[in-house]
């Protein structure tokens, strides 16, 4: 078992939380805690002490973080990043690497299981890559050199999802990223976003991106205060956005497509049967964002029949506006390899 929800054990429920990494409650963090954590995960007997990275869940990544602490002497879950699978395309820009997950395209019936929609409506998607995580502060700084103009006054952690974006902030970022990498990234179209969020050809038909239990896969209005308290206890004055990749990924290995920050989509619309990779651009067309955020309720986080959160203008900025990247597989230079 690689993942488990947990509950406070009775003798600790009313008292202080255990020190980070002290799985055995003996006020010492050592290899015995790694062994105990592995045992707890395999047997499903996890407690709050197994939550090494502070995301209110026990997971195999807590073991990884605990081992890092024993090897390097640091235990800071704000620097955590999810493991990158071999199938990912890894791109590096100015020393910062990020992963793109492959999404197999084909004929796609987006409304097949949606109420009050035409189940026969379909579009065609070619193969593409979707960002394994939302664009982070670290990546934004590597590309742009400074935070978004309207970002808050707090000091963000490098693996937080970047926020406070407008549509044109995203466009400026992508234009600069493409200059630096020689690749052709773009914002997700509506169909690309929903198809990937639902798990593509491996879709389990879940309500949220990877699960019917929103708490497994998303930071949203209903659980954000728990993690905020842990963050503020450890880092007073911390921001109100959250590190990426702390929840379970969906069927494609993509994180946070439900919750955390909402993700702005590309302009455009499409008629039935058209190729959704090439859209008519219209600067007057409204801008949408999908996926909900940690400021929104669960309804906004659905990937089946999601609520379309519309911005009135492409220059509109909201505190939970974030970005996820897309890259067409056909646009990659011949022989391109991860770097």
Q: Where does each model-flagged region fall?
A:
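Short Gly/Pro-enriched turn/cap motifs at secondary-structure boundaries
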Residues: 120, 234, 243-246, 312-317
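Functional-site microenvironments in short loops/helix caps that host divalent-cation chemistry
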Residues: 156, 167-305
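Short proline/glycine-enriched turn/loop segments at secondary-structure junctions
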Residues: 276-281, 309-317
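Short glycine/proline-rich turn/loop motifs
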Residues: 17-19, 146-159, 235-240, 303-309
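Cellulosome-associated attachment modules in secreted, modular CAZymes
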Residues: 4-82, 149-155
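GGW-centered surface loops in extracellular recognition modules
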Residues: 82-104
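A glycine-rich, coil/turn loop motif that links secondary-structure elements
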Residues: 22-28, 50-59, 129-130, 157-167, ...
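Active-site microenvironments of metalloenzymes and redox enzymes
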Residues: 108-116, 121-211, 327-331, 336
């Amino acid at each position: 078992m690689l993942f488990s929800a947990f509950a406070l054990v009775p003798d600790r429920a009313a008292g202080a939380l255990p020190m980070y990494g002290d799985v055995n409650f003996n006020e010492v963090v050592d290899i015995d805690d790694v062994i105990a954590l592995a045992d707890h995960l395999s047997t499903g007997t996890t407690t709050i002490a197994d939550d090494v990275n502070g995301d209110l869940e026990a997971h195999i990544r807590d073991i990884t973080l605990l081992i890092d602490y024993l090897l390097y002497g640091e235990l800071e879950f704000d620097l955590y990043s999810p493991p990158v699978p071999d199938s990912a395309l890894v791109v590096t820009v100015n020393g910062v690497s990020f992963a793109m997950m492959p999404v197999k395209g084909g004929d796609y019936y987006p409304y097949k299981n949606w109420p009050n929609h035409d189940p026969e409506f379909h579009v065609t998607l070619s193969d593409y890559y979707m960002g394994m995580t939302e664009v982070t502060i670290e990546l934004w700084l590597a590309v742009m050199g400074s935070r978004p103009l309207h970002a808050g006054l707090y000091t963000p952690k490098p693996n937080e999802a970047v926020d406070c974006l407008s549509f044109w902030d995203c466009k400026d970022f992508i234009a600069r990223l493409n200059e630096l990498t020689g690749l052709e990234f773009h914002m997700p179209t509506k169909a690309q976003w929903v198809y990937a969020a639902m798990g593509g050809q491996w879709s389990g038909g879940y309500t949220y991106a990877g699960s019917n239990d929103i708490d497994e896969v998303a930071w949203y209005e209903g659980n954000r205060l728990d993690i905020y308290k842990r963050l503020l206890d450890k880092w007073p004055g911390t921001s109100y956005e959250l590190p990426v990749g702390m929840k379970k990924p969906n069927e494609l290995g993509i994180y946070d497509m439900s919750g955390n920050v909402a993700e702005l989509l590309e302009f455009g619309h499409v008629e039935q049967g058209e190729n959704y990779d090439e859209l008519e651009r219209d600067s007057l067309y409204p801008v949408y964002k999908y996926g909900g955020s940690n400021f929104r309720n669960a309804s906004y986080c659905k990937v089946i029949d999601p609520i379309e959160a519309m911005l009135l203008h492409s220059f509109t900025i909201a505190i939970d506006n974030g970005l996820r990247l897309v890259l067409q597989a056909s646009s990659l230079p011949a022989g391109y390899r991860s770097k």
